[in-house]
Amino acid sequence: MEPPLSKRNPPALRLADLATAQVQPLQNMTGFPALAGPPAHSQLRAAVAHLRLRDLGADPGVATTPLGPEHMAQASTLGLSPPSQAFPAHPEAPAAAARAAALVAHPGAGSYPCGGGSSGAQPSAPPPPAPPLPPTPSPPPPPPPPPPPALSGYTTTNSGGGGSSGKGHSRDFVLRRDLSATAPAAAMHGAPLGGEQRSGTGSPQHPAPPPHSAGMFISASGTYAGPDGSGGPALFPALHDTPGAPGGHPHPLNGQMRLGLAAAAAAAAAELYGRAEPPFAPRSGDAHYGAVAAAAAAALHGYGAVNLNLNLAAAAAAAAAGPGPHLQHHAPPPAPPPPPAPAQHPHQHHPHLPGAAGAFLRYMRQPIKQELICKWIDPDELAGLPPPPPPPPPPPPPPPAGGAKPCSKTFGTMHELVNHVTVEHVGGPEQSSHVCFWEDCPREGKPFKAKYKLINHIRVHTGEKPFPCPFPGCGKVFARSENLKIHKRTHTGEKPFKCEFDGCDRKFANSSDRKKHSHVHTSDKPYYCKIRGCDKSYTHPSSLRKHMKIHCKSPPPSPGPLGYSSVGTPVGAPLSPVLDPARSHSSTLSPQVTNLNEWYVCQASGAPSHLHTPSSNGTTSETEDEEIYGNPEVVRTIH
């Protein structure tokens, strides 16, 4: 194992030698060549020539690293270490070499200052000076083969100990990313990052490079460089240079903070806006989230459709979970956004938000509340007022009695309205009169015999249906428990109502169906046709419905015993059958029948039938028994 590079103490080891020894095309995060050509602009070579080993004391991240582009292809898989303070820089080269060796062995002491270089480091606790290494008479060994060049805008630090072996494979190197537009030169010269304006001119030995015109990353301090190199508007004002800081340098931000800002801004813009807005758009307030879209537009400027391999979803989730401790230390919590003003911020109104943000907002959208109004009129007001005058014929809709006003209280749920009416208006068991005083009630003050009947009646006005069907998938609700009880028999198949006639085993789910069936046994025909001139009658309404189809379609080819002519009306035509002339002399055609209830009239049992054919020479009778009910297709005719 060869000794570390820092212990060899070469007389004048320069990074320019390493840069000129092997030149490889720079690669970005995806492993493809750089976006804007070779990142080493014209000032990079000249600036590297003046960089010496002592300049690495304040920025160990610029040191050579065994990591190549293939190790840094995925930035999301590498850990990001928290920030720490930097060692002070000393002019002595041996001491700087010793500190560089100590940084390799103990990586926790390194930091990543924003500016880099000796001018951007602030000593926290100066360590004891290391003893100078004894000079060796032997000539220095040749420099090792240069490693592949690091990524533009990336530096690496050793974040995990692996003993003092110094091997690259036994240590966990952490990728740090400088998000400024001039990352290559600024990291080695201490030049301003992005739009951070610290000094207008550089030193004679280290000239400040011109601002990069194709900046791709936002500044570490939350600013963005303008086209002319001047500082742009502040995107994150809480992260600006602190006035009280020595040298006007801001607090150092580690790579995790910078990557989080860029990814969160890009995710917020892609999720909420779906488009990039100008990075210099005016804002009404620093806390307005329109600045997030501006930051995202600035961060994504110049990338086009290139895949950044950034886990924007994870960054957005982390940003939604809350700011990290480092952000909370430097910036106060953001204020809630102001109410939308269409004249100033028309971009705030997005009815259809794409992606997860739209689904979340649809979930959080409050439902429209339905206002339920109580229209119960106080009976005390009705008692103190004179009776209303009789309505003139024709009666218009009657106004409230005597001008009495209803309760008019509004409620958000049906449960609240029902409780209000029951407790405040209906009253308890002390009430002897059970009268409905709902506005425009058709009962007109007619009382009920019991309180529960009044409560059931009030459901007609309120629309309450408190009895839902318990069977899954049904979804029917009922206002009365008796109706629900009858309905549940359709699911269970229960038929508790047995036919009362001997020898008949028919059963029914409700008593009304059993009553209809009983006419089969009594030979009563209470359901007769209402078409004038047709005297057909039946014992069951289903048979009458089958008969009514004859009046709605063409008759058979021969006139038949019914006496209908061969010319009929098509299906759906008005019910105006053409009867036989012998029968039509004493009958008139009925108008169009539009309601099923007008098709038949249920007569009382034993009532005489008065609709007979005048030409009949005997008593009209029909032998209709159980088989016609069992087979509804069979229609008996009158002879």
From Swiss-Prot:
Span list, region Disordered: 113-171, 189-251, 323-355, 379-409, 548-568, 607-639
UniProt keyword list: Developmental protein, Differentiation, DNA-binding, Metal-binding, Neurogenesis, Nucleus, Phosphoprotein, Repeat, Zinc, Zinc-finger
Cellular localisation: Nucleus
Biased composition (Polar residues): 612-621
GO CC annotation, single: nucleus
Pfam families attached to this UniProt entry: zf-C2H2, zf-C2H2_15, zf_ZIC
Zinc fingers classed as C2H2-type: ranges: 434-461, 467-491, 497-521, 527-551
Residue pairs linked by disulfide bridges in the UniProt entry: none
Location of Phosphoserine modifications: S554, S558, S576
Domain of life: Eukaryota
Function: Essential for neural crest development, converting cells from an epidermal fate to a neural crest cell fate. Binds to DNA.
Name of this chain's protein: Zinc finger protein ZIC 5
